Amino acid sequence: MAALDKATILNTDDLPREELDIPEWGGSVFVRTMTGTERDAWEQSIVSGGKTDLTNIRARMCVRVLVDTEGNRIFDDTDAKQLGRKSSCALDRIFAAAQRLN
């Protein structure tokens, strides 16, 4: 394998997306790998006072990884509560893909 330089690393598109069928919603979604910064923010958001906060964890993860065809997030963190009211089967499928990609 070749040694990589700074420019190569920083210019590489290393955030793959996976299209996932969600029949409960009548279509498909794209799940994207998080950046290192996004992953750190996610991990920080689920730990409070030394304890893990699992409240609405699937929806909280889903809003961070669901993207459009260009890779841009389609939800804000503030949408997690509303998304959490959607099908647990759909959220489980997205959450599993997010875990696999991240």
Predicted regions and their residues:
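Extended acidic low-complexity intrinsically disordered regions
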Residues: 1-16
